[in-house]
Every structure is written in C-alpha cells, then in structure tokens.
C-alpha cells in the first residue's frame, strides 16, 4: 500500500490523477453498507406492505444508477465505462437491519472502488428515504470496501 495521496500534487493541491499511460486491465470492487431499523419497519419492507412500493427494488436501481454517476458526485473520480453493476439487499431480521452489497466491474485504467462504495451507500440512503415517514432514527453504518482486484495495487480483501 502506498503512503502517498495520489490526488494531491507536489504543490499540495487536489488534482485528477493522470491515467493516460496506465494499462487497461480487468478491475472489480465489492462494497457493503448496513441500515439498521426497528423490527416493525423491517417487517414492513419484507412483507411488501410499504405504501411506496418495493423498497428493495427501488434501492437496487438507485444503487446501480449511483455507480454510473459516481464521477458526477465525487470531484476527482474519472468517468468510467462500467461493464457490470450488481446491488444485492439482504434483510437480516435477527439484527433488525438490511445488508447491502455491491459489485462493480470494468476493463479500464482505473479502479472501481468508489463506484462500488457509492452504489452501496446510495442504496442505503434510498431505503432511508423510502422509510423515513415510518421511522426517522434508522442508522446507516459500516460502509466499506470488501474487496478489489486488478490494477497496480493488486488484490485487497478484508
């Protein structure tokens, strides 16, 4: 792992990393997030009785859309031609929470970690948005990179 911030130049200014000379390689990243809620809120989601519709389907689509828009949200991210985005949601009633996982892939010159993290985060935010009328004290937590493959820095897995 590097001990240098690649997005800070010699003058200490933020800049977009030049990836022109980097090789095109297959890259993928997996991320997760959790949203904790009351058991009654989770049951409403699981039973499909939420008045706004299918919470998981909406959150999944939001996560996919967010991955595609990451460079619009995070200033120094490169716009990427993603070849796969997957968002999965798993109700965990024993913990009164939903686990969101995301997978992003491409063949390119830069990694997809931020896209995977953005997908998981926005899916969690979408669940919050859809359920806030029922419960306002839900907690989004543990947003993290689970794994990344490809590129110069190699393989990382928690």
UniProtKB/Swiss-Prot annotation:
The reaction(s) catalysed by this protein are: (8S)-3',8-cyclo-7,8-dihydroguanosine 5'-triphosphate = cyclic pyranopterin phosphate + diphosphate
Q: Does the keyword ATP-binding apply?
A: no
User: Which GO biological process categories is it annotated with?
Assistant: Mo-molybdopterin cofactor biosynthetic process
The record's listing under CDD domains reads: MoaC_PE
Q: Which Gene3D superfamilies match?
A: Molybdopterin cofactor biosynthesis C (MoaC) domain
The EC designation for this entry is 4.6.1.17
Q: Pfam families given for it?
A: MoaC
Show the GO MF annotations: cyclic pyranopterin monophosphate synthase activity
Pathway the protein takes part in: Cofactor biosynthesis; molybdopterin biosynthesis
Q: Which domain of life is it from?
A: Bacteria
- Judged by the first EC level, this protein's enzyme class is lyase
**Record key words, sorted:** Lyase, Molybdenum cofactor biosynthesis
- Lyase in keyword set: yes
Name the positions where substrate binds. 76-78, 114-115
Which catalytic residues are annotated? Answer: 129
Family label? Belongs to the MoaC family.
Subunit structure as annotated in this protein's UniProt entry: Homohexamer; trimer of dimers.
Q: Which PANTHER family match?
A: MOLYBDOPTERIN COFACTOR SYNTHESIS PROTEIN A
Q: What does this protein do?
A: Catalyzes the conversion of (8S)-3',8-cyclo-7,8-dihydroguanosine 5'-triphosphate to cyclic pyranopterin monophosphate (cPMP).
Q: Which HAMAP family match?
A: MoaC_B (MF_01224_B)
**Can you name this protein?**
Cyclic pyranopterin monophosphate synthase
- Whose protein is this, by species? Shewanella baltica (strain OS195)
Ranked from the top, the taxonomy reads: Bacteria, Pseudomonadati, Pseudomonadota, Gammaproteobacteria, Alteromonadales
